[in-house]
Every structure is written in C-alpha cells, then in structure tokens.
C-alpha cells in the first residue's frame, strides 16, 4: 500500500488553541455535536488534544487543523497541519 493512502486515513480535526505555554506543544479543543436520542437536542461535546507545533507559530485563540501521527510523547499523538484562522 502506498504511503499517501496510509496518510489519508489518519484522523484530521479542526479546533481552537487553548494553551501554547509548553515548548513546541499546543493544546487544541475540538467540539463535536450529537443529537440526544430522546429529546433530539444537539449536545456539544469537547475534547482536548495535545499537538506538536514545531515552530511555535500557533497562539491562543487560533483555529487550527491537526492530524494524527505516531506517538511523540506520553500524551501527544497529533501534529499541527495548518493554521486556518489567526486570532486577533
């Protein structure tokens, strides 16, 4: 199997940076929505992911895209792909 097909199967999430205090690491909050089975109301779930930011370019409030990668540390399994929108 080619490397490009394998790379395309990795999870890609878009979220908001909530912390950039660590060196080369950002914390990204990804919101997902699910419908409640009885009341049919949309409920927001959020999850935090640690991501590798090699050049320390993402700042708090930025909207970023992260991609799954090999384990980089105990909690880090994602890397920064792109900064979609800069914060003011």
From Swiss-Prot:
Pfam families: Ribosomal_S17. It comes from the Bacteria. Keywords: Ribonucleoprotein, Ribosomal protein, RNA-binding, rRNA-binding. The keyword Ribonucleoprotein applies. One of its GO terms (biological process) is translation. GO terms for cellular component: cytosolic small ribosomal subunit. InterPro entries: NA-bd_OB-fold (IPR012340), Ribosomal_uS17 (IPR000266), Ribosomal_uS17_bact/chlr (IPR019984), Ribosomal_uS17_CS (IPR019979). Belongs to the universal ribosomal protein uS17 family. This is Small ribosomal subunit protein uS17.
């Amino acid at each position: 199997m080619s490397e490009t097909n394998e790379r395309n199967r990795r999870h890609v999430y878009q979220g908001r940076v909530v912390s950039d205090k660590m060196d080369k690491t950002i914390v990204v909050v990804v919101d997902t929505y699910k419908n409640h089975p009885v009341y049919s109301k949309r409920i927001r779930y959020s999850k935090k992911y640690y991501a590798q930011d090699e050049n320390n370019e993402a700042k708090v409030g930025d909207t970023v895209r992260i991609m799954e990668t090999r384990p980089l540390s105990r909690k880090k399994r994602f890397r920064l792909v792109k900064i979609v929108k800069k914060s003011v």
